[in-house]
């Protein structure tokens, strides 16, 4: 059984394009606007690493891509992984 009620492990990097990135602002937005848990948002004004468990990874990607360039995107289905399948 999953430890989290959220199915998708969503990970990515956001690179600043025009405006400085603020990890606290990003953290607060994700926690308040996109249901999930196990959020990590760390970095500096140029680059932020996101790790978040959610059922709506597309919303995380949409928000993060509005802040800068996103890359190294990984979305894994933890439910499948729990059953020994590729996530």
Q: What are the functions of these language-model segments?
A:
Residues 1-87:
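N-terminal loops that bind phosphate or other acidic moieties
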